[in-house]
């Protein structure tokens, strides 16, 4: 099983299952979750230098253009973000703008698909 597959499977866990996984790993390897987080942050910085997009876990969904159907794009942006009509319109009119920040790959792809389905230009960063 590759690391990427393992990460995807872990991402599918519920919060309760993830908590149980952390406890099981702590017991199995005799470690604490707090130092593991610090180590994860420290090791994430050098990985940024290497061109390895497969390891990226958080994405920003950027609206690059409204396309032909601006009204439908505004409706989708409102549904995705919870913004009011004016705020959603300003976001769409000001493209390129970030619609959602730091979302999982699956969620980012879902959001991008919804926006593309109504004719918007979308980019994942």
Curated annotation (Swiss-Prot):
Superkingdom in the source lineage: Bacteria
Gene3D superfamilies in alphabetical order: 3.30.1390.10, Single helix bin
Pfam family, any one: Ribosomal_L12
Record field: transmembrane: none
Keywords: Ribonucleoprotein, Ribosomal protein
One annotated GO molecular function: mRNA binding
SUPFAM superfamilies noted in UniProt: ClpS-like (SSF54736), Ribosomal protein L7/12, oligomerisation (N-terminal) domain (SSF48300)
Keyword match rRNA-binding: no
One GO term of the biological process aspect: translation
CDD domains attached to this UniProt entry: Ribosomal_L7_L12
GO CC, alphabetical: cytosolic large ribosomal subunit
NCBIfam families according to UniProt: L12 (TIGR00855)
Family: Belongs to the bacterial ribosomal protein bL12 family.
The protein's assembly and partners: Homodimer. Part of the ribosomal stalk of the 50S ribosomal subunit. Forms a multimeric L10(L12)X complex, where L10 forms an elongated spine to which 2 to 4 L12 dimers bind in a sequential fashion. Binds GTP-bound translation factors.
Purpose of the protein: Forms part of the ribosomal stalk which helps the ribosome interact with GTP-bound translation factors. Is thus essential for accurate translation.
Name of the protein in question: Large ribosomal subunit protein bL12
